[in-house]
């Protein structure tokens, strides 16, 4: 049996979603990293690298290994049975975002080669095939939506996960603007657009839900207090069963119109409230992108 201090972070996801950026972030954090490892070599590689490179290893796999990807869940179960701590991250983005990134970089999608189709196919078709091939891995991983974040932000977020990785369930609270789309990595989504909006108060418009005048304004509203209480009750009831089901992460997304006031306020308050019992992380999609 391997030492129980061995920690593996597996990075998979859509082509163009930022897997290389995430891997570089882990390398900066002290992980020994390898890119595009064939899935059938995973267990042997982990055993070898544990002997030579210490207790923290990060591995990136992509759809170029698609024919062997069904082996990965079984390999991960085997490693966990040997006492290895395994975390699986899946990077994703909207199809429109991926198309734009491929257009900007002028790179060819790895599935566009003839051996997959017998003839060239359009980018949209290859992305659709890739989603189908990676669906099972996505279902078993912590999903990170990179659609609205830059490379430096993604690196920072992946690094922020590091202290939480060895623990049990981690709660990720994320604020967002509905006008920019619902985060694809959300496990639960709460719509708070019906709450009083500080945007229409001239003295609060340029502030955020972190600022005390906005906090004071929102806490005076009965419906804001009720919303917070209802979300707290829901999460308080279901987090323990989720943790017992071996979930490593739960992402709670809270959205308002602009992602600046109401959703930010609730993310800050809920993260503070649940931090006594769970490891919590905070993401403000629209604020972090400024």
UniProtKB/Swiss-Prot annotation:
Disulfide bonds listed in the record: none
Annotated binding of ATP, by residue: 13-20
Pfam families: PapZ_C, RapZ-like_N
Gene Ontology molecular-function annotations: ATP binding; GTP binding
Transmembrane segments: none
Keyword entries, A-Z: ATP-binding, GTP-binding, Nucleotide-binding
Residue numbers binding GTP: 62-65
Function: Displays ATPase and GTPase activities.
Family affiliation: Belongs to the RapZ-like family.
NCBIfam families (UniProt xref): PRK05416.1
Family annotation (HAMAP family): RapZ_like
Protein's UniProt name: Nucleotide-binding protein Aave_3603
């Amino acid at each position: 049996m391997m030492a129980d201090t061995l920690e593996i972070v597996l990075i998979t996801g859509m082509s163009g979603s930022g897997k290389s950026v995430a891997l570089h972030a882990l390398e900066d954090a002290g992980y020994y990293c390898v890119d595009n490892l064939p899935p059938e070599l995973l267990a042997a590689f982990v055993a070898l690298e544990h002997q030579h490179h210490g207790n923290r290893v990060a591995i990136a796999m992509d759809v170029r290994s698609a024919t062997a990807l069904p082996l990965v869940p079984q390999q991960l179960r085997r490693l966990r049975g040997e006492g290895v701590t395994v975390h699986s991250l899946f990077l994703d983005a909207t199809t429109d975002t991926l198309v734009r990134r491929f257009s900007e970089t002028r790179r060819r999608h790895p599935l566009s080669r003839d051996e997959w189709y017998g003839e060239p196919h359009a980018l949209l078709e290859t992305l659709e095939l890739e989603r189908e091939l990676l669906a099972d891995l996505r279902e078993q991983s912590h999903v990170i939506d990179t659609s609205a974040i830059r490379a430096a932000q993604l690196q920072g977020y992946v690094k922020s996960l590091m202290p939480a990785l060895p623990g049990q369930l981690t709660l990720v609270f994320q604020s967002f603007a509905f006008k920019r789309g619902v985060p694809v990595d959300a496990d639960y989504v709460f719509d708070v657009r019906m709450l009083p909006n500080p945007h229409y108060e001239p003295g609060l418009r340029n502030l955020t839900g972190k600022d005390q005048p906005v906090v004071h304004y929102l806490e005076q509203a009965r419906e804001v207090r009720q919303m917070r209480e209802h979300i707290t009750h829901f999460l308080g009831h279901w987090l323990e069963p989720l943790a017992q089901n071996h979930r490593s992460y739960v992402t709670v997304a809270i959205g308002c119109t602009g992602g600046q006031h109401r959703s930010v306020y609730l993310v800050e308050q809920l993260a503070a409230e649940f931090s006594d019992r769970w490891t919590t992380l905070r993401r403000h999609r629209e604020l972090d992108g400024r």
